[in-house]
Amino acid sequence: MTPTACATVSTMTSVGVRALRQRASELLRRVEAGETIEITDRGRPVALLSPLPQGGPYEQLLASGEIERATLDVVDLPEPLDLDAGVELPSVTLARLREHER
């Protein structure tokens, strides 16, 4: 194995583009097993090959704390506010503005 083909740095494996092409199936199996692999081009890191996060976008946002689960049921939500007379809904305003663009 040549130094640029594949090397382990700390706990991450570093693989050159050529080695990636030659050993793609093997490397993908390792990624599926949870390993992250650094891809290099002429010794310069250019990408990381890593496993996909578990769950969909909603679960990922929950796990990261960016969103929280709803605490109310939809049936418990308050009724929409009545608009004052003469106030136009934003959707109506947008449709009117787009009409002039045509």
Swiss-Prot record:
Task: Provide the GO biological process annotations.
Answer: positive regulation of growth
* Biological role stated in the UniProt entry: Antitoxin component of a type II toxin-antitoxin (TA) system. Upon expression in M.smegmatis neutralizes the effect of cognate toxin VapC46.
**Source organism:** Mycobacterium tuberculosis (strain ATCC 25618 / H37Rv)
What is stated as this protein's family in its record? Belongs to the phD/YefM antitoxin family.
| PANTHER family membership | ANTITOXIN VAPB46, ANTITOXIN VAPB49-RELATED-RELATED
Give GO terms: molecular function aspect only: toxin sequestering activity
Name of the protein: Antitoxin VapB46
Q: Enumerate the InterPro entries for this protein.
A: Antitoxin_Phd/YefM, phD-YefM_TA_antitoxins, YefM-like_sf
Please provide the record's keywords in A-Z order. Answer: Toxin-antitoxin system
Give a yes or no for keyword Nucleotide-binding in this entry. Answer: no
Q: Which residues form the signal peptide?
A: none
Q: Which pairs are disulfide-linked?
A: none
